[in-house]
């Protein structure tokens, strides 16, 4: 159609309302070397009554085919009954600017799809790891040598390609998700050989590996505003960009739509800037998924300034479905290295989400408010199911779960990094839920974070290794026996610094062990509100694994620092009143007023040196049992108080093997040491 409009210079064919000829308008509306097209010139009414599908489709298709800029009419309301689809080849610049206009779908069809079409051929290749000089220096680089016996289409360093194979992608959650990943050319050696420093995984090392050069199309979509009505059975996506290099979506907006809004499928370096959405219908039983931004098998997307209310996910990753042997390269692979910044999701089912196949997704300064348990979702502000994701300076308020990590579908080891995370929620809500997979190494690293909850437990951990530093947990629960950390099967908790604070209820603990075999190593922890506490560590099993706790309390505990632990439990080091020279577990003043045998406990003390001062008030007063030491070399000083009126006898017995009994007069003492099996005498 554009060719028909473009007449010879000076042509007077056709006159517009403003008196200009079509040719004059065509010549004057160039933009960066491309034509500027108006849907009105194609017959679009934009009056909210007429069906504008056909003229809009033709206008967009012309712009995509030849390279051009479409500018909608400010104030127009375009009713559409079918998809506006365009395909864009190499080297084209396409801009679709609908700022100030609105689209109203009248059928269950996608509003707009733009697909990049590679003009280069698909190449079947083999790969091998080699050392090659890719720069001007003398140091070689480990790279992938890619050989295409039938030839490839790459011509220079820096070009971007896509590789794929008929093997299922890593950590797939559907059996139709196949491996694929982009790469950057490092060196073109010949028409059949090139090199890349991108690391192809083992999924690409077998047969049937293919590559293609990603089209160099530039696509910009501005001001797309779509408003619909919730309709049972509707599920179509709104905007889908597929197979494009660095597409840019500027200020898209939606309201009351029935499926995903912005879909990035197999794109490289996409940007979505300031998207805004309200009320995305979520009905999984109908195939309707309220994804606001769906980042699908794309690489390095940047999503800035999400503002979304009432959706399944404000942001999510996914891996598209495809056939193992087709050449739809944009439908291959998983989402890699995307970053979501300054996002806000309110009243969503799970505001920010990643599916299992994703890798390296980063959320920075994102906020989730009021996420709830919706249809087929779990109510987490941040739901992380991929590997190597990170939450940086993020906040969840009143979400059912602040942040949830699960490795159920992860086929190998996985990690999550959390820094500067803040959570606040009512009773029944949980700050963190971390669930790993038995037999794998699932790690979560947390730093400089704070959460406050009225729930019985602030965190729940199962089959995950947690390393935390400077984490403050505030538990305001009135429920008896609450805890800042709940440690389950196969879990390890290591913390340094930070605090646990209690301000209501009674019988609380810093840590509650919910299963055998858990490991706890807590150092330099500040604990306030000890008047509301019963233990530092409450065990729900008789053997709790390896435990070491060092805490600074603001007052004494009513009993032992560890409750319900078996004799194999390790140790606790407790300080009180902010004064680390006062060690209640390291010193005990006792009285023995009977001639029976007495077994005394260390209260699980982990101090290097422990001192007991015992007052003996009856003849034959003796100690014939001591609970095990925390570690080899731990010392126990036992002294007979100057106030003793009788001798104090230390006998061989339970965990005591001195060779002979020791009798102590008033004011005398003995030093014992733990050798890993028994207490032995060191001096008298």
UniProtKB/Swiss-Prot annotation:
Domain of life according to the entry: Viruses
Principal location class: virion
GO biological process: adhesion receptor-mediated virion attachment to host cell; symbiont entry into host cell via disruption of host cell envelope; symbiont entry into host cell via disruption of host cell glycocalyx
Annotated compartments: Virion
Record Gene3D superfamilies: Single-stranded right-handed beta-helix, Pectin lyase-like
The keyword Cell membrane is annotated on this UniProt entry: no
A GO term from the CC aspect: virus tail
Claim: Transport is one of the keywords in the record: no
Keywords: Degradation of host capsule during virus entry, Degradation of host cell envelope components during virus entry, Host-virus interaction, Viral attachment to host adhesion receptor, Viral attachment to host cell, Viral tail protein, Virion, Virus entry into host cell
Main function: Functions as a receptor binding protein (RBP) and probably mediates the attachment to the host capsular exopolysaccharides. Displays a depolymerase activity that specifically degrades the K5-type polysaccharides of Klebsiella pneumoniae capsule, which allows the phage to reach the host cell membrane and bind the entry receptor.
Record text on subunit structure and interactions: Homotrimer. Interacts (via N-terminus) with depolymerase 1 (via N-terminus); this interaction probably gives rise to a branched tailspike.
Stated family: In the N-terminal section; belongs to the Przondovirus depolymerase 2 family.
Protein name per UniProt: Depolymerase 2, capsule K5-specific
Annotated source species: Klebsiella phage K5-4
